[in-house]
Structure formats: structure tokens, C-alpha cells
UniProtKB/Swiss-Prot annotation:
Keyword set includes Ribonucleoprotein: yes
Provenance organism: Penicillium crustosum
Region listing for Disordered, in residue ranges: 67-107
Taxonomic superkingdom: Eukaryota
Stated name of the protein: Large ribosomal subunit protein P1
Pfam families the record matches: Ribosomal_60s (PF00428)
Gene3D superfamilies reported for this sequence: 1.10.10.1410
Compositionally biased intervals (Acidic residues): 90-101
Subcellular location: Cytoplasm
Any one GO biological process: cytoplasmic translation
Gene Ontology cellular component annotations, sorted alphabetically: cytosolic large ribosomal subunit
Amino acid sequence: MSTAELACSYAALILADDGIEISADKIQTLISAANVQEVEPIWASIFARALEGKDIKELLTNVGSAGPASAAPAGAAGAAAPAEEKAEEKEEEKEESDEDMGFGLFD
């Protein structure tokens, strides 16, 4: 991320944490107060439009949680384990067959 994106992101998080509505003017005010010089005003308006009407706190609390997933039947999970073991055995056999058999490329 660029400095401008980080500054706008942090400003939006500060506003959301204080319960203040996120707007381009408020983001720009926070960026100016932080003495960040490299941010063009367009970034503040882009972030304000992107976050308009969204609950930032809810977004942050739901980042790690996934939607409900359907549970796999117990029999299917048990059948998958032997298949994985067979795949591992095949991989090991391939490694053994790659050993040097005395034939060189330039012999």
C-alpha cells in the first residue's frame, strides 16, 4: 500500500472508532493534522465513497469469521484419509525412482 492509502485507511479507522461519520473532509482533516504531505485530496474522497453507509466496526469484527459451512458426512471424511495415504505413497515411490541409476548425461 502507498502512503496515501495507508493514511486514508488509518483516518477512516480513527473516525469509525470515535463513532464519527466518515466523509472526505474529515479524512482530509485527520491527514492534515497528522502532517502527512503526500496525500492527494482524491484519495480522501475515494475512501469516503467506498465506506459510505458501511459499518466499519462490523466489517472488522466479521473479517475472520466465515459463513456457515455444510458439514461433511462422517463416512466421507473417513474415506478421504486412505486416499491421501495412497497419494503420499505414490509420491515417495516417485522419489525413489529418481535415484541415480549409474547413467550419466555425458557418459
